[in-house]
């Protein structure tokens, strides 16, 4: 059953605790007592199966995110925010969690945050945990309630101060303050399953209405919300639930008194419905600049991991080594490249941007790696492509493999020339290949899917039945059509919207999948070009790109007016790049377009080609260091040239100036002659692109470049 660390004698008994708690900051005599030490209740179980079959091998809170266990991020956040005692409640795989914590810095005698581990096979929900908190009288004042898969750098001192002040002034009426972060509905860290719409009192931040939006097309609000408020009501759909709650001791008591409360959402809805009867209120605290998110599915895992690599969770960045682990020593270089100790990178391999290489990892020759995290002691063969790939410890990827937006768990192996389409998952020790393509959404595990049926009664118990399952595995063979001729594993799920279980498929590991039939008539009838769909895949929302483009334009305008140096302009553009989750490719496209458009923004009316060049060329000269910062490789040159071509196809009256513009790019050493010639000679182009290349001035410029190249070759 349960093993519980000794609870300090300072904890009051139940008779004293029922008085409503000391969280309101009461007074004694003439002087106010200082606030008691801050406590936290950390729930190290999700009580759902969103991460199955991954979490069949290890609990969610121990899954590595940027090579650090999720629970370590949560405990670091709690400690940084001033928590001095944390109760960690474990159920599923409790022994693994306990072992991890006991070996970590959190259980060291010098830890500022005393971690007490409480385990039980009987917990089935958050409600069970909080009823146990109440039964054991663990909390003696306001406490933080949080799951062990939350990543945050929020300073909650202001929210805590507001919470305590409210309880003092209103005689403990407010029992909970929920922490939210401002976030647009299209932001990558918005989880569809957790999206909520709130009605909030404009003056007091009291939550009046709380509704999950999953599966809803329309929302309704009680009319009384608006009739009873003197100061106005805000309807908010721009908030991300950080799953951080400041609770009074009454919260645990209310869960005891209401056994139908199983989740925090049950609790919130129950209190709002019965507010007039019980007199309890819930408030919210909103942060705009800090970071907080819960890793509730693989979509959120990917989004939060990307944010850590891009340094949005500072100071929780990979090179900081906040876990004090000898294997977490990283160096950080430009474009967010992180390398652990004893990393080997083969000749011709390119780490493009946002890449983390774990200690002891070996990368072969001519590999391309971008937006990926590779765990310790991995081996990557030659000519491998990794794009948004997440590899855990000891993974092996053979030559010629391609992995796109997929997850490979501990010691998984990908054989030669295997292609993983987006949203694939290989759980621990799975082998696939060689020469196989895994369809999008494939999940391969060493645990047979039919073993699920045998576990329904004991799905939250510990791993006592693991040996029985291993015996079942031995009796069942692997299907080479699913995992390849040398593969080892069973196919759990391949997304197929034609199956009857499409609701379950949409609730896959990667989160809620959009059902196209539910889109509005206008959207569903709109025809979309396949190239447009390709361009959207793996890139931010179009709205974010438009906003980024406007921000870059504003930055350059201000730079020109205030004479800001190019180095500082690069810093500002980089910060915008990370803010809107923009790739380097898109930065080059936007930068090229914005600069070429700049003269048109400054002059009313139509510009002729000569006047346009007169305005543009000085700008190119002034901002050439900005271009050179982003345009380095041949692929970068071609992307910039494609953006230049697109601009002139949009502004056909300016095509006569294209040759002068390209000459300026060439003379300023932004674009190289070989890439300009390569761009001009492209065959797979549109009719308009072919027509553009027939421009006489452009052809003369290309001929001049070719002759210059020949002369250079003769001189050599």
Swiss-Prot record:
Pfam family, one: LbH_EIF2B
Keyword presence, Cytoplasm: yes
The entry's keywords: Cytoplasm, Initiation factor, Isopeptide bond, Methylation, Phosphoprotein, Protein biosynthesis, Ubl conjugation
Secreted listed as a keyword: no
Record text on activity regulation: Activated by the chemical integrated stress response (ISR) inhibitor ISRIB which stimulates guanine nucleotide exchange factor activity for both phosphorylated and unphosphorylated eIF2.
Residues recorded with modification Phosphothreonine: 317
GO terms of biological process kind: astrocyte development; astrocyte differentiation; cytoplasmic translational initiation; hippocampus development; myelination; oligodendrocyte development; ovarian follicle development; positive regulation of apoptotic process
Subcellular location: Cytoplasm, Cytosol
SMART domains, sorted: eIF5C
InterPro entries, per database record: ARM-type_fold, eIF-2B_epsilon_N, eIF2B_epsilon, Nucleotide-diphossugar_trans, Trimer_LpxA-like_sf, W2_domain, W2_eIF2B_epsilon
Residue positions where Omega-N-methylarginine is found in the record: 18
Region annotation (Disordered) ranges: 1-35, 443-481, 517-539
Composition bias type Basic and acidic residues, residue spans: 523-535
Composition-biased stretches (Gly residues): 18-28
GO cellular component, one term: cytosol
Covalent cross-link site, Glycyl lysine isopeptide (Lys-Gly) (interchain with G-Cter in ubiquitin): 56, 98, 136, 212, 500
Domain W2: residue ranges: 538-715
Ranges of biased composition (kind: Acidic residues): 451-466
Main location: cytoplasm
Molecular-function GO term, any one: guanyl-nucleotide exchange factor activity
Family: Belongs to the eIF-2B gamma/epsilon subunits family.
Stated role: Acts as a component of the translation initiation factor 2B (eIF2B) complex, which catalyzes the exchange of GDP for GTP on eukaryotic initiation factor 2 (eIF2) gamma subunit. Its guanine nucleotide exchange factor activity is repressed when bound to eIF2 complex phosphorylated on the alpha subunit, thereby limiting the amount of methionyl-initiator methionine tRNA available to the ribosome and consequently global translation is repressed.
Subunit text: Component of the translation initiation factor 2B (eIF2B) complex which is a heterodecamer of two sets of five different subunits: alpha, beta, gamma, delta and epsilon. Subunits alpha, beta and delta comprise a regulatory subcomplex and subunits epsilon and gamma comprise a catalytic subcomplex. Within the complex, the hexameric regulatory complex resides at the center, with the two heterodimeric catalytic subcomplexes bound on opposite sides.
Name of the protein described by the UniProt record: Translation initiation factor eIF2B subunit epsilon
Gene name per UniProt: Eif2b5
